[in-house]
Amino acid sequence: MGRDQPVMIPRPLVSVVDDDESLRESLPDLVREFGYSAQAFSSAEAFLASDYLDQTRCLILDVSMPQSMSGPDLQRELSRRRREIPIIFITAQGDETIRLHLLDQGAIECLIKPFSDTALLEAVRSALHPK
């Protein structure tokens, strides 16, 4: 008699694109604690060139990355490529106008740094499990 093997259900992949090294290390760890898979990239270009583009189910994206394509530029590039990936923007800019603009452009959420772990968890859950 053989034992039934448990069915392994792949965990959704959340990709983090941020030029800040500390966030590139801490956010994927936090996402993994939520029970998801995570990958981090130092630039939009690195994300676009990666093998993870097609696997990504949610993108946590810094708005401003001076040495690379900006978060909104990456959002437009994904749209141009017809990639429908829910995006959670993170920004140090506390300007509500920018936040509202990003939400109007299709972002799931725009979190102002510093944000709570709970706020990020809620945004990731909303992105991966829309009502």
Segments and roles (model prediction):
Residues A40-C58:
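Acidic, metal-coordinating helix/loop segments flanking the phosphotransfer/catalytic sites
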Residues M69, D73, G94-E109:
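Alpha4 helix (beta4-alpha4-beta5 surface) of REC/receiver domains from two-component response regulators
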Residues E21-Q39:
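Two-component/phosphorelay signaling modules centered on CheY-like receiver
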Residues T97, F115-R125:
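C-terminal output helix
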Residues M65-P66:
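Receiver (REC) domain active-site loop signature in two-component systems and cognate sites
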Residues E45-A46, S70-R83:
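Short amphipathic alpha-helix used as the core "switch/output" element in two-component signaling
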Residues R11, Q55-R57, R81-P86:
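His-Asp phosphorelay/catalytic-motif detector in bacterial-type signaling
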